[in-house]
């Protein structure tokens, strides 16, 4: 069994995990019946894990969203997408591996799937540029979305990026323009679009494939205008204030539901999606099918009008509370 990567706030579970592994090894190496002891320890570990995850701060949710074993775009595709065929290239000069896309079927319904893809280890992350797409990635996504529009395929996008790549070459190649064009063109598409934040939803990098009729989000995912570290560095010149920035930015599913940004927050297994990826896949698949069914009942005009109106409603603001004022002073 692959060793679990535990986050700092999960360290109280380390000793229990060791005991559970020892008992499993004992059961494999002998005929001693340890099922009762194993059940007791697993129940205790599950209860403590649930207590920890029910009290996560926004800063801790970011750690969960960035967990190296959290299911990725390709993981979810393998879980519930049949006949997956990846499509490559922006038909200009690149094939960005940080943003993938292709045709698949979900419950006999043909769809276009696009999404950012991170790596599992350093080598994969370098190849995938840590999920940070360059201009070619967004142009590839737009090419595929236009393909979907032409053939009347609903679009499913999975968002998982710290942000669009901000390197010099990316800026020279028109990173801002590529994202801006995607925003404009996605409002014009005549097919249903469902976006899901499966991990990090960072800044314009997320928005580049995030103009959707329905925006879903896992409960331990985050969706933010800027990373808390960057925000703290800008506001206070101190990245150590990232937890304060995380609280002020309203990056969690519950906050974004209250603000009318997110349409649905998907529940995660106890401990996060990395503890039970298949269960997370079942939850996501059910929601996608349900939302696709609802959107299919709308005419093209209704679809585009509602999508436009949804984003026009964003940007409302509240007067800052005393706590917010303390955070920004």
Swiss-Prot record:
Compartment annotation: Cytoplasm
Keyword Lipid metabolism set for record: yes
Record carries keyword Plastid: no
Record's signal peptide: none
Chief localization: cytoplasm
EC number: 2.1.3.15
Catalytic activity, as annotated: N(6)-carboxybiotinyl-L-lysyl-[protein] + acetyl-CoA = N(6)-biotinyl-L-lysyl-[protein] + malonyl-CoA
InterPro entries, sorted: Acetyl_CoA_COase_a_su (IPR001095), ClpP/crotonase-like_dom_sf (IPR029045), COA_CT_C (IPR011763)
Positions of the CoA carboxyltransferase C-terminal domain: 40-294
GO CC annotations, alphabetized: acetyl-CoA carboxylase complex
Key words of the record: ATP-binding, Cytoplasm, Fatty acid biosynthesis, Fatty acid metabolism, Lipid biosynthesis, Lipid metabolism, Nucleotide-binding, Transferase
Cystine bridges: none
GO BP annotations, alphabetical order: fatty acid biosynthetic process; malonyl-CoA biosynthetic process
Pathway: Lipid metabolism; malonyl-CoA biosynthesis; malonyl-CoA from acetyl-CoA: step 1/1
MF GO annotations: acetyl-CoA carboxylase activity; ATP binding; carboxyl- or carbamoyltransferase activity
Protein family: Belongs to the AccA family.
Assembly, per entry: Acetyl-CoA carboxylase is a heterohexamer composed of biotin carboxyl carrier protein (AccB), biotin carboxylase (AccC) and two subunits each of ACCase subunit alpha (AccA) and ACCase subunit beta (AccD).
Function: Component of the acetyl coenzyme A carboxylase (ACC) complex. First, biotin carboxylase catalyzes the carboxylation of biotin on its carrier protein (BCCP) and then the CO(2) group is transferred by the carboxyltransferase to acetyl-CoA to form malonyl-CoA.
Record protein name field: Acetyl-coenzyme A carboxylase carboxyl transferase subunit alpha
Species name: Prochlorococcus marinus (strain MIT 9211)
Upper classification of the organism: Bacteria, Bacillati, Cyanobacteriota, Cyanophyceae, Synechococcales
């Amino acid at each position: 069994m692959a060793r679990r990567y535990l986050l700092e706030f999960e360290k109280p579970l380390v000793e229990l995990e060791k005991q559970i592994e020892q008992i499993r090894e004992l059961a494999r190496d002998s005929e001693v019946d340890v099922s009762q002891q194993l059940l007791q320890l697993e129940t205790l570990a599950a209860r403590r894990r649930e207590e920890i995850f029910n009290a996560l701060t926004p800063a801790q949710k970011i750690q969960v969203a960035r967990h190296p074993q959290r299911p990725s775009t390709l993981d979810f595709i393998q879980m519930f997408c049949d006949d997956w065929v990846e499509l490559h290239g922006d038909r200009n000069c690149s094939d960005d591996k940080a943003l993938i896309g292709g045709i698949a079927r979900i419950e006999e319904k043909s769809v276009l799937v696009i999404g950012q893809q991170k790596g599992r280890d350093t080598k994969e992350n370098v190849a995938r540029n840590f999920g940070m797409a360059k201009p070619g990635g967004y142009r590839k996504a737009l090419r595929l979305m236009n393909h979907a529009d032409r053939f009347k395929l609903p679009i499913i996008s999975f968002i998982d990026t710290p942000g669009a790549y901000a390197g010099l070459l990316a800026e020279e190649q028109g990173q801002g323009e590529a994202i801006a064009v995607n925003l404009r063109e996605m409002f014009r598409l005549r097919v249903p679009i469902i976006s899901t934040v499966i991990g990090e939803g960072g800044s314009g990098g997320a928005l580049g494939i995030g103009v959707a009729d329905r925006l879903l989000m896992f409960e331990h995912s985050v969706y933010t205008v800027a990373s808390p570290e960057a925000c703290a560095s800008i506001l206070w010149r101190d990245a150590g204030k990232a937890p304060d920035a995380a609280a002020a930015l309203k990056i969690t599913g519950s906050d974004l539901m209250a603000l009318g940004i997110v349409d649905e927050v998907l529940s995660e297994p106890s401990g996060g999606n990395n503890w039970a990826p298949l269960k997370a896949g079942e939850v996501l698949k059910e929601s996608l099918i349900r939302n696709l069914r609802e959107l299919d009942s709308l005419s093209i005009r209704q679809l585009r009008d509602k999508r436009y109106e949804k984003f026009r409603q964003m940007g409302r603001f509240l007067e800052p509370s005393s706590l917010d004022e303390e955070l920004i002073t």
